[in-house]
Amino acid sequence: LLDAKSWHDRAMTPQDLHALVDYNYWATHRLLAAVDALTPEQFVRDLASSFRSVRDTLTHVHDAEWIWLSRLHGVSPTSRLPLDRFEDCAALRAGWAETQGGLRTYVDGLDDAGVQRVVEYRLLNGSSSADRAWHLVQHVVNHGTYHRGQVTTMLRQLGAAPPLPLDLVAYYRERRG
């Protein structure tokens, strides 16, 4: 195992980050396909989760991706977007498409130096922080994975069919053919 400093200094490649971002949206699209089957009432039903409903949880993930993408571009948002801004899954998907395209474009434009670049930003509470670009992109993907698991549980609570497998290895297998 690498010690903490060695691990922190070891960079992913631009290709590694591209694969992770591609996986992130592959899994998100699979999840949204399952969410499409929900009724409008199910989409917003309070399930007493971290974020009350399927809509609120997915909106939170989209919002977080938008915030991190903004920070990667040197802009630090000072507030979150409202969780109730999407009426249905179609509106959520449309709103997410721009952020998805932005993150893909950002990662596609990275070279080795860009991957290692230290990004300085402010948290929503106003405190400052700085992290390498590849750490932030990894965080976006990991955050999405965490909440996709929550939404999968919510779908089961609602009696809806869970999504197709969302595992990273399933993504690699599918890409391999």
Residues covered by each model-derived region:
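Leucine-biased recognition of intrinsically disordered, low-complexity hydrophobic segments
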Residues: 1-2
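Short, contiguous alpha-helical
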Residues: 18-82, 123-177
